[in-house]
Amino acid sequence: MFCNNLLLIIVNMKYSWVVYILCCSDGKLYTGVTNNIEKRVNAHNAGEASKFTRARLPVKILAASRFMTKEDAYRLEYRIKKLPRNKKLQVLKVE
């Protein structure tokens, strides 16, 4: 049930907002939005970003996708968060 090491990143620097999915140490998934993915993942691993990940350290980036607007990023985050785990993994093509 733990996440494998697959990392999918679509990078284009003109896009400033990132929707990311983290794999926690217990195999649970966490989805979020940021404008600085490196800083945000470091904050998660320092226990400073969310209560959910603080109890499940360390975390790894499983997937990330960049967007031009904050609104588009939050729309995708909302859609992903509504999905059950198996659907998230299907969307990401992760086992």
Where would I find each of the regions flagged by the language model?
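GIY-YIG nuclease catalytic motif and its immediate N-terminal context
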Residues: M1-E48, R54-R66, E71-K81, N86, ...
